[in-house]
Amino acid sequence: TPTYEPTIDDYRRRKKDEIARHDSSDEVNAFYMQGQRMWVDKATRAGLMLRLQAEQSMGKETTTLWYGSHQFELPMANAFQMLYVLELYASQCYDNTQRHLAAVDALESKEEIEAYDYRSGYPEELEF
């Protein structure tokens, strides 16, 4: 019986799966706050923004953010700025991942696909 030889589409699918795993990994989804490594997903960021807006509208000047059992007291302006910067970082990561997926679609050989480095182009992890 003949051995199965993966097609170029199989190689593409495999590389795109690697890219998707990398995109959702803590190699991409991480930042540091006061030395603590963490990540907050898009839904949590949206919820935090709503919370900050509500607190600010009630005249609060500081807010308390939690990550697990870690408490962070921040001036309201710093909390907003942190979320804006974090959202921009997440958008840059998303855009870079999409560029990698498009690049893999444009490659024309199994060897090119296999050798493609999808870890490049991501922004430096943020530190607050």
Which residues are covered by each model-predicted region?
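A preference for well-ordered globular domain cores
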Residues: T1-F128
